[in-house]
Amino acid sequence: MSERKLFTSESVSEGHPDKIADQISDAILDAILAKDPEAHVAAETAVYTGSVHVFGEISTNAYVDINRVVRDTIAEIGYTNTEYGFSAETVGVHPSLVEQSPDIAQGVNEALEVRGNADQDPLDLIGAGDQGLMFGFAVDETEELMPLPIALSHKLVRRLAELRKSGEISYLRPDAKSQVTVEYDENDRPVRVDTVVISTQHDPEATNEQIHQDVINKVIKEVIPSSYLDDKTKFFINPTGRFVIGGPQGDSGLTGRKIIVDTYGGYSRHGGGAFSGKDATKVDRSASYAARYIAKNIVAAGLAKKAEVQLAYAIGVAQPVSVRIDTFGTGTVAESQLEKAARQIFDLRPAGIIQMLDLKRPIYRQTSAYGHMGRTDIDLPWERLDKVDALKEAVK
């Protein structure tokens, strides 16, 4: 009998408390970058019933109305009704932002490689904003080269948001979660969806029967291809029986608490660093994007069915301390060849990544819900496949 295995990933909607915090942090980042592309930003957000706290470190000469940015973001998400316990116009906003530490700024603004040497490459100028390790991943089981469980999980909560905002399902409220379990065969290929879990906030008048019927017919069956569903697929819709109290009224939220949702749903390793609220000198963010860029182009080039890229940095140093590529036995060339090619083709210094991916632009708010990787609804530079030919040529 062939061996089959299950793998599960989850996603959350833009109205989930942690995602509200992520979106506020990235909206602040975008507002600052729109006025000052050279700004250094590390904006953290905490949300709970009736209150938002924004704190962190920022170095910029630009003025941004933090209060307005926070309220506009909350309204865009859909928290515009005081009955939700969290509303854009009535929430208390408490900003507490200070200047970036000069000790950190010293290493970021003048990398180890250029100190005392005026003849260095200008892209050596910016040092990594911190030490750390980052991972990027790609796999050929979906069109967007993402693991199927996280891809489906994101699409389910995005569909819920579309139905809520269009008014097609009028009783939906902003908070929601999804979880998808996929069955893989002995060749590690997805063959069916075993379980779908969806919890969605709703008005008190909505019945469980109505919610169950709408979610299955208008969400699940619209998102998940019928070839993956069968009579053994299990659906759990609002399994607690009631989800009226949600959002920050139900749970507090913090920036950076959904790092697995933001990336690969647990299918790949994670270095632990969050993305939202951080400008691109923070390699937690920029190097994770670069690693995805490398992995996706490797798989798209047919050099592996699955690829995981690890990058690691030392604070204040421009060049990565290590580059590691793992193809899990699916590669068509040696991993050492791929690593050499990656170093040749992709500039992995922080300034090189920023230039390569054009990361000084205000593009981050759109990434802060429904995943930073594998997005087909928005144009993200690390999702482009413009290095495929160069990789093929480099490993000949």
Swiss-Prot record:
Keywords: ATP-binding, Cytoplasm, Magnesium, Metal-binding, Nucleotide-binding, One-carbon metabolism, Potassium, Transferase. GO terms for biological process: one-carbon metabolic process; S-adenosylmethionine biosynthetic process. It catalyses: L-methionine + ATP + H2O = S-adenosyl-L-methionine + phosphate + diphosphate. K(+) binds at E44. Mg(2+) binds at D18. Pathway: Amino-acid biosynthesis; S-adenosyl-L-methionine biosynthesis; S-adenosyl-L-methionine from L-methionine: step 1/1. InterPro entries: ADOMET_SYNTHASE_CS (IPR022631), S-AdoMet_synt_C (IPR022630), S-AdoMet_synt_central (IPR022629), S-AdoMet_synt_N (IPR022628), S-AdoMet_synthetase (IPR002133), S-AdoMet_synthetase_sfam (IPR022636). Binds 2 divalent ions per subunit. Its cofactor is Mg(2+); K(+). ATP binds at H16, D175, A176, K177, R242, F243, D251, R257, K258, A274, K278. Its EC number is 2.5.1.6. Catalyzes the formation of S-adenosylmethionine (AdoMet) from methionine and ATP. The overall synthetic reaction is composed of two sequential steps, AdoMet formation and the subsequent tripolyphosphate hydrolysis which occurs prior to release of AdoMet from the enzyme. Homotetramer; dimer of dimers. Belongs to the AdoMet synthase family. This is S-adenosylmethionine synthase. It comes from Streptococcus pneumoniae (strain ATCC 700669 / Spain 23F-1).
